[in-house]
Amino acid sequence: MITITLPDGSRREFEGPVSVMQVAHAIGPGLAKATIAGQIDGGHLVDASDLIEHDAILRIITPEDQEALEIIRHSCAHLVGHAVKQLYPEAKMVIGPVIADGFYYDIYSKRPFTPEDLAAIEQRMVELIAQDYDVVKHITARHDVVRLFKERGEDYKLRLIEDMGPEVTAMGIYHHQEYVDMCRGPHVPNTRFLKAFRLTRISGAYWRGNTKNEQLQRIYGTAWADKKQLEAYMQRLQDAEKRDHRKIGKAQDLFHLQEEGPGLVFWHPKGWVIWQTIENYIRRVYRNSGYGELRCPQILDVSLWQKSGHWDNYKENMFFTDSEKRTYAVKPMNCPGHVQVFNQGLHSYRDLPIRYGEFGACHRNEPSGALHGLLRVRGFTQDDGHIFCTEAQIEAEVTAFHRQALQVYADFGFENIQIKIALRPDKRLGDSLSWDKAEAALRAALSACEVEWQELPGEGAFYGPKIEYHLKDAIGRTWQLGTIQVDFMMPARLGAEYVDERSQRRHPVMLHRAIVGSMERFIGILIEHYAGIWPTWLAPVQVVIANITDAQYEYAEQVHKALLNQGFRVNIDLRNEKIGYKIREHTLQRVPYLLVVGDREKENGTVAVRTCSREDLGAMSISTFVERLQTEQVV
C-alpha cells in the first residue's frame, strides 16, 4: 500500500504506484481536469503522469498556483517547436527556456523569419491548442534519443546531448503529436492549458551565445494561466514601451551606445549630471556608514585571478590583454583589489570591522545578443563595498546594511521590496561546513530585522551565499538590485589575516555588498520607473527661466543668477520665441519647474511657477520658490 498525504492533512491509500493524475481523479473529476503537475514532499515538481512509488506528501499543481506559470511557459516553448516544424520543416530546433514573464525558442533557419512568419506561427499554435491533444512523456534511453534526433536531422539537439555527462543514461522526451522534444519537465498534460499566450517578437542570437558561432533566430513569447492575466501583461508591455529607457534617453539627450563599443555607454552632459547626483548620494551613504572610499587598478595580472578563484569559475566572462610577456585581466569584479588594500599591514581584531567602498569600473564579456541598453552592458560601475569582520560581527553588519539599503531605496521612490537568500550552487568554492555557517549567518541577520524572505537554492555566487533585494517599479516589474554576500573563502585564498585576542592569526570574514549595483543599470531602471519625469533632486535641469519679451531680459538674468548661487541646476531661455512655444518645449523635456517672467513678475520681484505636469502654481517670490526647491533635495 502507498499512502498519499494531501496539504489539508487528509490521506489516500493506493494498492501500488500511482500517478499524480490518478490521485487527482480519486479526489474528483474537477481537480483532475485542472491538474497540471505535482509537488512531492515539498520539493521537486513532477509531471502529472509521473508515478509515485512510496509514501509521500503530494501537492497538486493547478493553474491557480504560482508554480504553474513556469510549466505553462515551458510547454508553450515546445508548442512553438511543434508549430515551426509543421510550417518550416527544414528549421532546426535549438533550446527553448523559460525567462521572466515568458519564454523563447532559438531556431536555426536559413531563411530569416519575418513578422508575417511570427503571425503564422502564432496562428498555427492556436490551431494546435484547439485540437486539445495530450502531451505525452516517455523516459527514453540516451542511445534511443540520439537515434531519434539523428533520424529527424536535429543537429543542435545532438550537440546538447553530447554536452551531457556519461551519467545521463536516459531523458524525458515529450510528444506533441508528431513533434518531439527533450526536457527535464514537467510539462502540461494537455494543450488546453496553453490558451493564454502571445508571441511577442523575433530577434537574433548565436549558438552558445558566441558571436563566432552560427546565427540563430529567437522567437519570444509570453504565456499565462488565463486570458485576464495575459491581457494585463500585454497592457504592462505597452506601458513599458512608453517608458523604454533607450527612447527616453535619446529624447532627453542623456546617453547613447554605438556599434564601435557594444555594451559600452557614452554619457552626455545631462545624463552625467544624473550619474554624479547618484554617485554623490551614495558617497554620503559611504561616509555616514563608516566606509573608506578607495580606488583600485582596472587590470591585474591573471595570477591574482587564479588565486581568487575567478580564473576557474569566471574566465569565460573576462577580458584579457598581454604586455611584456604577461597576461592581465580587466577586472570583472572589485573584490580581489579590496583584499590587496586590506593586506597592506597587519590588522588587530580591534580594527575590525573595516569597511571599504569603491565606485569600481568593471568589464564583463557578456554575449552580444544579451546586451540591452543600460540594463545589460559590458562596461559598468558598481557602488561596490567590502566589509572585513569577525564571524561574531556578521549579524550586526548585515543588519546595518539591510536598514541602510531600505533607506536608499525609499529615497529613490521604491517601497515594494522583496528579500531573497540565494543559497549554494553546485559549482562553488569551499567546504559544506563553511557554506552552512555563511547561510546561517544571513538567516540570523534577517530574523533580527524581523523581515520575511524567500530562499533560492542553487543561486548563490560560487564564493558565498547572498541576500538579494528585488524592487517593484511603478508598473509592477521586479528588478534585482542590492546584494550582500558572506564570503569565508576569498580572504583565505588571498592571504587576508588579522590578529585575534589570543595573538593568533586568523582570516577575516568578507562581506561583499552593493545597494544599487551597476550604476548604468540603476539609471536605466530609474528612467523607466519615473518614465523620464525626474524628481527635482535627480533632474539634470531642475529649473528653466523663460522671459515673455526682451523687456524682462535683465530680470530673468537676475533670477537665473540667484538660483545658480543657491546651487540649483538652472537654464535660461531668452530666445525670441512665443512663450507658449517655450513652455511646450521645456514641458516635453520634463524639466520639473518652468519660471515665466513677464512685466508683472518683473515689477513685483516674483516668478510665475509651472510644473512639468502642466500645473500652474501661480506667482511666488524667489525666496519662497527657493524654499520649495530645498524641501525637494535629497542631497
Curated annotation (Swiss-Prot):
GO terms for cellular component: cytosol. Keywords: Aminoacyl-tRNA synthetase, ATP-binding, Cytoplasm, Ligase, Metal-binding, Nucleotide-binding, Protein biosynthesis, RNA-binding, tRNA-binding, Zinc. One of its GO terms (molecular function) is threonine-tRNA ligase activity. Zn(2+) binds at C335, H386, H512. PROSITE patterns: AA_TRNA_LIGASE_II, TGS. Catalyzes the attachment of threonine to tRNA(Thr) in a two-step reaction: L-threonine is first activated by ATP to form Thr-AMP and then transferred to the acceptor end of tRNA(Thr). Also edits incorrectly charged L-seryl-tRNA(Thr). This is Threonine--tRNA ligase. It catalyses: tRNA(Thr) + L-threonine + ATP = L-threonyl-tRNA(Thr) + AMP + diphosphate + H(+). Its cofactor is Zn(2+). Belongs to the class-II aminoacyl-tRNA synthetase family. It comes from the Bacteria.
